[in-house]
C-alpha cells in the first residue's frame, strides 16, 4: 500500500521574529493544507529548514505535526542525516511520535559511495517499523542514488518502499521505474516535472508549490490520475512561472517570502539563509498575482 497518492506538501517551518519555532502558526499552515486538498504533510524536510533545527526542535516539530494533524492525512517525518546514527535516532523518535513514514535524504557533504548508501539506508530502515521514502536530491547533497542502488535496496529491505526523486533527470527516473519493476513508489521531488514523472508511473509529488497553492498542486496530480492528462498538463504549465520564481533563489527562501506575501506571517529564515533579493521578490509577486494567489 502506498504511503500516499497525490500531492504532499514539504511544509515550511514558521519562525517567530526571534527565530523560535512558531507552533501556533504551524498549526494554521497544516489546516490550510488539509482544507485545500493536500494528501500528505511532510515535516522537517529541506523546505522545513531541518538542517538548522536542533534535535530537540526537530523532534518537537514532528510530534506537533502528528498530534495536530490527528490522522486527517499521513504525516511523513524527515529524519535523514549525513550521520547514520543521527538518522537512526531521529527515525526512532519519529516512530514513537506516531509518524506514518519517514523521509531519508541522501547523506550530504560526505559523498558516500553507492555501497555506503546501501549500508546507510539499510541500517536506518532496519531500526524502525515504518515505511521508508528515500530522497534523492543530488544538486543539494552531492550524492546521487543510482537506479541500480535503489533496486538493491527495495529488493533487500522490506520497508524501503518509495522515493522522492529530485534529480531533475527524467531519463534517470525512467531507468529507476524500469529497474525497480514496480516495487518502488516514485514521487516527483520537483514541481516543474510532476506530469513527466506521473507519465512514468509516479504516484504524485512532494511539493514546495503546495505551500502556497495546495488545491492546484493536488489537482495537477488528481487530473492525471483521473485520465485528464491535458487538464493536468495545462495546470502544470499555468503554474510554471510561479514554480520558476519559487526556485529563483535557494529553497525555502522564495516560498517563505511567498507565504508572507499571502499574509501567513511565517517569519524569517534561519542563518545562513537570508531574505529574498528585491528583484527576485518582485518577479515572484508578479507571477503570484497573475494566477490569483495574491
Swiss-Prot record:
Keywords of this entry: Amino-acid biosynthesis, Cytoplasm, Diaminopimelate biosynthesis, Lyase, Lysine biosynthesis, Schiff base
Gene3D superfamilies: Aldolase class I (3.20.20.70)
EC number per UniProt: 4.3.3.7
GO biological processes: diaminopimelate biosynthetic process; lysine biosynthetic process via diaminopimelate
Superkingdom of the source species: Bacteria
InterPro entries named in the record: Aldolase_TIM (IPR013785), DapA (IPR005263), DapA-like (IPR002220), Schiff_base-form_aldolases_AS (IPR020625), Schiff_base-form_aldolases_CS (IPR020624)
Subcellular localization, as worded in the UniProt entry: Cytoplasm
Protein name: 4-hydroxy-tetrahydrodipicolinate synthase
Species the sequence originates in: Lachnoclostridium phytofermentans (strain ATCC 700394 / DSM 18823 / ISDg)
